[in-house]
Amino acid sequence: MLFIDQPLNVGFSNYGDRNATAQVSSANEAGEHLLNFMDNFYKQWPVLKQSPLYITGESFAGHYIPAFARTIIMNTTWQATTKVKLAGVAIGDGWVDPPNQFNYFDSLLYSAGIVSNKFRDTVTWFQTQGIVNLLKG
């Protein structure tokens, strides 16, 4: 099992210079960076090419995992060269559609008993403000 904290300067990964050219600006670019890493990884450990590749992540990886999987699937040259087979993708608690996901926080918290009816309107107000701010960028 290989754990990769990616993209650079997210989580515990640190490139050093946060203004470096290695900084990514999109999920697709992160997918390209990860494919480049995997290419070098398989050159170092060619025996692992025989193992099925599962890509997993949680939370904001809901943006990056699909991009990485798409990068692999669309790059038929890389697949043919490495002979690596993408066997599966899993995303836990993915942050894939923030505006729509925000819409259900109040209901989720209320139905789980985390927020009482007394505070539900307050949570709904903060939820609405969160959506407004999210859409503003």
Q: What does each model-found stretch correspond to?
A:
Residues 46-60, 85:
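Alpha/beta-hydrolase fold nucleophile elbow
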Residues 32-51:
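Conserved acidic catalytic loop of the alpha/beta-hydrolase fold
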Residues 2, 6-19, 24, 31, ...:
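Accessory cap/linker subdomain of secreted extracellular hydrolases
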Residues 44-50, 76-80, 137:
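Surface-exposed helix-capping loop/turn segments at secondary-structure junctions
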Residues 42, 55, 62-79, 89:
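Short glycine-enriched nucleophile-adjacent loop
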Residues 23-35, 60-66:
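Phosphate/oxyanion-binding active-site loops and adjacent basic polyanion-contact surfaces
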Residues 5-7, 59-62:
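Catalytic nucleophile-elbow at a beta strand-turn-alpha helix junction centered on a G-D-S/GDSL motif
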